[in-house]
Amino acid sequence: MVNMKASMFLTFAGLVLLFVVCYASESEEKEFPKEMLSSIFAVDNDFKQEERDCAGYMRECKEKLCCSGYVCSSRWKWCVSPAPWRR
């Protein structure tokens, strides 16, 4: 009886240890692509998009006018593409 309890305990402890090791290695692998992508797509201050004088698609149009090709929705106050029934 004692040997069976000890072997079950050791088996359970081994499975827990295996789970912890696998989880740790998987979390390290997940960080690597994030770091690589962030270094590839790092945006320099010179290349940042400048603030426009007009609001683009699905942007609020309360204070800014919509860019060309968009109209301000009277209901939602967003810039949307003009629909045929609105003309």
Swiss-Prot record:
It comes from Cyriopagopus hainanus (Chinese bird spider). One of its GO terms (cellular component) is extracellular region. Ion channel inhibitor. Residues 25-52 form a propeptide. InterPro entries: Huwentoxin-1, Huwentoxin_CS1. Residues 1-24 form the signal peptide. Belongs to the neurotoxin 10 (Hwtx-1) family. 51 (Hntx-8) subfamily. Hntx-8 sub-subfamily. This is U3-theraphotoxin-Hhn1j.
